[in-house]
Amino acid sequence: MHYNVKEICENYNFEISGVSFIGTPKDESMLFVTNKVKNMISNLIGHRNCLVFVETGIEVPDNLKEDNCILVVDDPQSEYAKLALKIEKSEKENSKNK
């Protein structure tokens, strides 16, 4: 998986190369945070270049926004899944064209 977040968040220019979970986030990954696990948002401290779909209403500290692309949405799990499918489809098409 390789995706430049600039495509959906023009203030950032970095690539994500995989997925992770807010319980154990990884740099350069895509993940989501719902109200159910909002207390884990602090797990992002020290991590960089993550694309994070965060449920509306969750407060995200400014320092996390500096190092990561935070997208506040109503249904983060669904938005995460949609983008993952889009990336997968794009990568399959690119591999066919090689």
Model-derived regions, located:
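Terminal amphipathic alpha-helical/low-complexity segments used for targeting or macromolecular assembly
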Residues: 1-97
